[in-house]
């Protein structure tokens, strides 16, 4: 039986818990990234965090000593925006989220609105308001489709776990009887979109 060895040309890796943990560098991560860059390998760093834009995340990683260009960062916000662009180009959305998500949606030509949006999109935010959640519930009840950037129920913080997208999506789902479509990890869609973004493929 002959074994064929294929050369790995593209790497997808998790940011959280693989390269950094609560904004502290995991030992060896900087050497690994440097090695990929030195050998010309394509790579994308993946994160379910939708708060920050890739530029913001690149700056935050640089503070830990990790030099990752913004074009090598793929967030659940980017994956969500690309997914919605394929489903309904130039659509509209009501967003519970921050700059990472709103910027990604604007970049694909989406209009953000509270009036009769095509989608309600729930992402990470450090301040979920009762008013915004209530608005989301009413819009979904009126027919807007329900999308969430990722299913993670909690996220890390220096003080301990805090509620994240999955928990808030569950609250809205309970109130509406509508389950969201989760775009981020572990949905393979996020990985496929990432590979497409750097023009690679999986085998």
Predicted regions mapped to residue ranges:
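HAD-like aspartate-dependent phosphatase fold
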Residues: 2-15, 19-203
């Amino acid at each position: 039986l002959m074994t064929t060895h294929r050369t790995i040309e593209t790497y997808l890796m998790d940011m959280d818990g693989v390269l950094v943990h609560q904004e502290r560098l995991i030992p060896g991560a900087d050497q690994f990234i440097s090695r990929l860059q030195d050998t010309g390998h394509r790579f994308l760093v993946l994160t379910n965090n939708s708060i920050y834009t890739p530029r913001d995340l690149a700056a935050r990683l640089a503070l830990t000593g990790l030099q990752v260009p913004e074009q090598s960062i793929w967030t659940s916000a980017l994956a969500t925006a690309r997914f919605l662009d394929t489903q309904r180009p130039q659509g509209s959305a009501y967003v519970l989220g921050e700059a990472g998500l709103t910027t990604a949606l604007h970049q694909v030509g989406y209009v953000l609105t509270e009036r009769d949006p095509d989608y309600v999109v729930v992402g990470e935010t450090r301040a979920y308001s009762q008013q915004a959640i209530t608005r989301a519930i009413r819009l979904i009840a009126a027919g807007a489709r329900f999308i969430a950037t990722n299913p993670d129920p909690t996220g890390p913080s220096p003080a301990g776990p805090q509620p994240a997208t999955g928990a808030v999506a569950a609250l809205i789902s309970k109130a509406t009887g509508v389950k969201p479509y989760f775009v981020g990890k572990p949905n393979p869609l996020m990985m496929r979109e990432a590979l497409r973004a750097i023009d690679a493929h999986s085998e």
